[in-house]
Regions:
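N-terminal basic/disordered segments at the start of proteins
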Residues: 3-10
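Amphipathic alpha-helical segments in well-structured domains
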Residues: 4, 38-42, 80
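N-terminal active-site beta-alpha-beta segment that forms phosphate/nucleotide-binding
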Residues: 15-69
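Histidine-centered active-site/metal-ligand motif
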Residues: 25, 154-155
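Short, solvent-exposed amphipathic alpha-helical segments in soluble enzyme
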Residues: 39-41, 155-161
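Internal, conserved structured core segments that host functional sites
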Residues: 65-154
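Gly/Ser/Thr-rich active-site loops/lids in small-molecule metabolic enzymes
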Residues: 159-186
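Acidic/aromatic/glycine-rich contiguous surface patches that form carbohydrate-binding/processing clefts
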Residues: 187-264
Length: 264
C-alpha cells in the first residue's frame, strides 16, 4: 500500500521542481491502493509543491453548453477525475472563471495565475492559464493517463490557429460567481473529431527528443513534460504538418526522425 511518504519519495525521484509550477492530469485508480485514499494523494502533491504552484484542471466542457449554459464556480463539478473534484474544494485552492476549461490552483501566485480566464472566448487562449503555464516554464505531469489527456496540446494548436479545431460561431455561456453575479461569456467550442484522441502519435518523438520522460507515481506510470520544449517541438511539427493530429495513424518514420535531435 502506498503512503504519503512513499508518494513524496516518488515525486522526488521524478525530479519535479518544487519551486516551479506543476499541472497534474490524473487517474486515481491507476495509482493503486493508497493509505487514506485520494486525500492522501492530494496531501502529497500539495506538500511537495508548497514552495511553488500546484494546478489541476477542473473542466466542465462535458456538460456546460447552450442547453445548460451556467457554470457555477463554487458548485459545478469537474468532469476530469476525482482528484480534480476533491482538489477544487480544498482550503486555499482557487478556481478560474472559464465556463468550460477552468483550472484550480494552490500556492505561489495562485490568484494571479487563474485571473482573467473569463475574458477569452476560446478554451485555451494564449493569455489564459493555459498560456501562463508556458510563461512560467511549467511542468505537466500525467499520472496514469497518456498524452491524449494533455490539454496543453489543444492550447498549442489554438495558438498556431490550426484550422477546424474551434467553432466559428459563439455559444452563449455564463459564469456565476459566489455572490450570484453572472458574467456573460460567448464561447467558441472545440469542434469536429475528438482531436486529443490522436495526441498519442507524438509520444515517441517527445521521449527521444527529451521533451518528456516517464517515471513512477504509486502504481501509475507518470509522464513528465516540459512546457517550453514541448511548445517549441510542436510549433516545428505543426508548421510542417498542420494536419498532424487530424488522423489517428502513426507518424511517418522519416517525418518523425527529423525532430529527434532538434535543438530545443
Amino acid at each position: 500500500m502506498h503512503t504519503k511518504k512513499s508518494l513524496l519519495d516518488d515525486l522526488k525521484k521524478l525530479s519535479i521542481d518544487r519551486n516551479g509550477t506543476l499541472l497534474v492530469h490524473s487517474s486515481m485508480k491507476s495509482i493503486g491502493e493508497v493509505e487514506g485514499g485520494a486525500d492522501t494523494v492530494l496531501d502529497a502533491l500539495s506538500e511537495y509543491m508548497e514552495p511553488g504552484l500546484l494546478v489541476l484542471p477542473t473542466h466542465t466542457w462535458s456538460y456546460i453548453n447552450a442547453e445548460n449554459p451556467r457554470f457555477y464556480v463554487d458548485d459545478s463539478p469537474s468532469c476530469v477525475g476525482i482528484l480534480t473534484e476533491l482538489f477544487r474544494k480544498r482550503p486555499g485552492v482557487v478556481r478560474s472563471l472559464h465556463p468550460t476549461h477552468s483550472v484550480a490552483a494552490l500556492g505561489k501566485d495562485a490568484e494571479d495565475f487563474i485571473a482573467g480566464n473569463e475574458l477569452f472566448d476560446t478554451p485555451c487562449a494564449r493569455g489564459s492559464s493555459w498560456g501562463k503555464l508556458l510563461d512560467r516554464k511549467a511542468t505537466i505531469m500525467l499520472i496514469g493517463v497518456d498524452l491524449t489527456r494533455n490539454t496543453f496540446i489543444h492550447g498549442v494548436e489554438e495558438w498556431i490557429d490550426i484550422p477546424g479545431r474551434l467553432t466559428d460561431t459563439h455559444e452563449q455561456l455564463y459564469t456565476v460567481l459566489s455572490d450570484g453575479t453572472e458574467i456573460s461569456i460567448p464561447s467558441r467550442r472545440h469542434c469536429g473529431k475528438i482531436w486529443s484522441d490522436h495526441f498519442w502519435k507524438v509520444e515517441d518523438v517527445f521521449l527521444k527528443s527529451g521533451v518528456m520522460y516517464i517515471g513512477q507515481f504509486g502504481d501509475a506510470q507518470a509522464r513528465v513534460c516540459d512546457t517550453v520544449s514541448m511548445t517549441k517541438l510542436l510549433f516545428h511539427m505543426l508548421s510542417l504538418d498542420p494536419d498532424l493530429f487530424s488522423d489517428n495513424n502513426p507518424l511517418d518514420e522519416d517525418f518523425a526522425k527529423q525532430f529527434i535531435d532538434i535543438n530545443l
